[in-house]
Amino acid sequence: MRIGIGYGAYCRGDDYEEGFKKMKSHGYDCVDYGHINNKNSELYKLSSEAFRAYFEKVRESAEKHGIEVWQMHSIWPTVNSDKTETDRQKTTEFFIRQIEAAYYLGCKKFVLHPFLPFGNDVEGDYSFTFQVNVDLLKKLIPHAEKWDVTLCVENLPFRNNPISKVSEVKRLVRTINHPRVKVCLDTGHANIFSSDIASDVRLLGDDLAALHVHDNTGWCDAHKLPYCGKLKWCELLTALGEIGFRGCFNLETAISNDMPEPYREEMRTSLAKLTRSMAEQIK
């Protein structure tokens, strides 16, 4: 099985050449590309030709070093960004541009977060929240088909939000019932709601298409390294094997760039080895 890690764990902004090289040397196969999840990014101001050229260059660099852009991380929800129809339409336009970028990167999995029309951690109106997300996905499906991308809806860490739990994301995806719409399981987010991560995996089954792997104590979205929180890793790996998951075991955690050398290099290498050993247990 492939193993991967987030772009920011090794790369900074447009400085990715050395990052991809190190990523591969430490043992990773894939990257979760996140250098486009800021609405204020200068990349969105590029012409169509320059936009395409930029991401094709990133892809060429990754491929040169043996790294596949397995999945892409979309815009993270922000307070008051999805409250009005105008706000949601603007965000949808960003999603559409990102899906196009995914194609140029050779990326097949586009991870997106549900709309939060009442705020990040506010219950609001369940039916309305659910419906605006159904509408969002239906708008994005034609673009996913055009650019050969699968939309992977991510579960969230907000306790009071109606579409945060794995079960609710599953319901959303089943309501759409389209082969281009699947789920990205964020293990840390799921652990905030339940310690039974294996049941979440089994519930998702064939709808599981991507992973964000990290740990926490069940209290907050801490993005700890595996085995540094309370997530039941053995049960998770067993369940992934049971459902036949054969995608990328992708970390959404990293060794801090502030860690002094040579310890940073040693810890990065060790983390990659640990990740590989975990992926090998998924049978």
Describe every region a protein language model picked out:
Residues E56, S61-H65, V79-K182, E265, ...:
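Active-site acidic/histidine proton-transfer and metal-coordination neighborhood
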Residues M1-G4, A9, G13-D29, T92, ...:
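Histidine-acidic metal/acid-base catalytic patches
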Residues Y44-E49, E85-R88, Y126-F128, H223-C228:
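Short glycine-enriched, charge-decorated loop/helix-capping segments at active-site entrances
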Residues G34-V58, N120:
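Glycine-rich, proline-tolerant flexible connector loops at the mouths of alpha/beta enzymes
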Residues K39-Y44, T78-K83, F118-G124, I192-F193, ...:
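A short acidic, helix-capping loop that chelates divalent metal ions and anchors anionic groups
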Residues M1-G6, W70-S81, L116-N120:
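N-terminal small/glycine-rich loop or linker at the start of catalytic domains
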Residues A9-C11, H35-N37, I75-T78, P114-F118, ...:
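Active-site-proximal loop/turn and secondary-structure-junction residues that shape catalytic pockets
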